[in-house]
Every structure is written in structure tokens, then in C-alpha cells.
Swiss-Prot record:
Its EC number is 3.1.3.77. It comes from the Bacteria. It is an enzyme of class 3 (hydrolase). Disulfide bonds: none annotated. It catalyses: 5-methylsulfanyl-2,3-dioxopentyl phosphate + H2O = 1,2-dihydroxy-5-(methylsulfanyl)pent-1-en-3-one + phosphate. This is Enolase-phosphatase E1. It comes from Alcanivorax borkumensis (strain ATCC 700651 / DSM 11573 / NCIMB 13689 / SK2). Pathway: Amino-acid biosynthesis; L-methionine biosynthesis via salvage pathway; L-methionine from S-methyl-5-thio-alpha-D-ribose 1-phosphate: step 3/6; Amino-acid biosynthesis; L-methionine biosynthesis via salvage pathway; L-methionine from S-methyl-5-thio-alpha-D-ribose 1-phosphate: step 4/6. The keyword Coiled coil does not apply. GO terms for molecular function: 2,3-diketo-5-methylthiopentyl-1-phosphate enolase activity; 2-hydroxy-3-keto-5-methylthiopentenyl-1-phosphate phosphatase activity; acireductone synthase activity; magnesium ion binding. Its cofactor is Mg(2+).
Length: 226
């Protein structure tokens, strides 16, 4: 019996294109001014110090820091300082109504159905927890945060490492064999399965993917009895 579902975002609840073509460029365009305007803010300086530690570089100015973060965006780095600062920038975009977060049409109805059945719902994404809350709070299906019991990001650990899922299981405090992890990335599902999770690969493009895991083209086709 499935007691909790943990879902990825990109390629799972939502289109990768929205993140790549809307959110990433929005943050990239605003990074230099954001850092210049908020350079002395403690929350920003905390991330600058973390970025210095991760990169081995000294980031003594907003311009130098912006150059590093823009390079990380180009490299699609899953660095926690980058994700945290992106979340701060995206917050303004959501609140200003510059965009709403994309959700596949089946996502919100399925989340609501599962929630009504008493299944606890969680998110595990490489985006920061702040960014995740904004994503589901300002979605094109409305505010979905009331359906979610919690969020996990890279501070828990990399998504392709089994220990990350063990930490999630401990935090949720339910047996691993009652947890279901949803993702479009095979290696993430492999790591979750190694931790004892049930898994399902989302094939949103209906590409006929072959997998060691159960495959579903959308949330309506996910079999909770597996």
C-alpha cells in the first residue's frame, strides 16, 4: 500500500521547457542587478560564501559572483547556492505576475485525488525548497501548496545517490516499501529503488521508453497498487 508519494518536478509534474526557456533565462538576465542590489544582505552573503567554498574561487564583487553563477547556469550545475539565489529572483517574478509555473493538465487533478485518499505528497527537486514552494504556489493550476506535506532539495543530497532517499524515508517516517517516487530520470529511480522505494518513470513525451521501473505517460496511468 502506498502511503506517500514523492515527485520530481521537471519532466514529471511540469514541462522541462518551462524551466529551461522561462525560469532559467529570467534569472540569468537579472542575476547581475540582483547581486549588486542585494550584495550586503545576509542571505545573499551566505550563498556567496557557499559558492566560494564549492568553486574554490574568491568572489569579492557582485560582478565576479554573477559571472560564476551565469557559468553554472550554462553548465546546468545543481549547486545549492545557485538554486537558492535563483529562487530569490524567481520569487519576484511570480509575485509580479511575470509568469505562472507550468503544470501538465493531469498533475493537479491527480495530486488532489491522491490527497483526498489520505496519501501524503512530497516534492524532491534539485531546485531549492523556496523555488519549489513558489512553483506550486503560483502554478497555472492555482495554489497547490495545501496538498503538499513537505519538500526536499539538494540540501538532503544529490538525487542520484541512494543515501538521499534513505534520508527522505527517515524524514517522512514511513516504511520505504510504502513510498512511491516519481521521476523522468532513470538514475534517480535506480537510487530510490536501492533505498527500497516503489518507483515510476514518467514518459511524458510518450517515447516508448524501456525501463527497469514501471512506466507511465501521465499521472492518470500511475498504478498505486504496484
Amino acid at each position: 500500500m502506498i502511503n506517500a508519494i514523492i515527485t520530481d518536478i521537471e519532466g514529471t509534474t511540469s514541462s522541462i521547457a518551462f524551466v529551461k526557456e522561462v525560469l532559467f533565462p529570467y534569472a540569468a538576465k537579472r542575476f547581475p542587478d540582483f547581486l549588486a542590489d542585494h550584495w550586503d544582505h545576509p542571505c545573499v552573503q551566505e550563498q556567496i560564501k557557499a559558492a566560494e567554498k564549492e568553486s574554490g574561487e574568491t568572489l569579492g564583487s557582485a560582478d565576479k559572483a554573477a559571472a560564476l553563477f551565469l557559468r553554472w547556469i550554462e553548465e546546468d550545475r545543481k549547486a545549492t547556492p545557485l538554486k537558492t539565489l535563483q529562487g530569490m529572483i524567481w520569487k519576484a517574478g511570480y509575485e509580479n505576475g511575470d509568469y505562472t509555473a507550468h503544470m501538465y493538465p493531469d498533475t493537479a487533478p491527480a495530486l488532489k485525488k491522491w490527497h483526498q485518499k489520505g496519501i501524503a505528497l512530497y516534492v524532491y527537486s534539485s531546485g531549492s525548497i523556496t523555488a519549489q514552494k513558489l512553483f506550486f504556489g503560483y502554478s497555472d493550476a492555482g495554489d497547490l501548496t495545501g496538498l503538499l506535506s513537505g519538500y526536499f532539495d539538494t540540501t538532503t543530497g544529490p538525487k542520484q545517490e541512494t543515501d538521499s532517499y534513505r534520508k527522505i524515508q527517515q524524514a517522512i517516517d514511513k516504511p520505504a516499501n510504502t513510498l512511491l517516487f516519481l521521476s523522468d530520470i532513470e538514475a534517480e529511480l535506480d537510487a530510490a529503488a536501492e533505498a527500497g522505494f516503489n518507483t515510476c518513470l514518467l514518459d511524458r513525451q510518450q517515447a516508448g521508453l524501456e525501463s527497469r521501473h514501471p512506466v507511465a505517460s501521465n499521472f492518470n496511468h500511475i498504478n498505486l497498487a504496484d
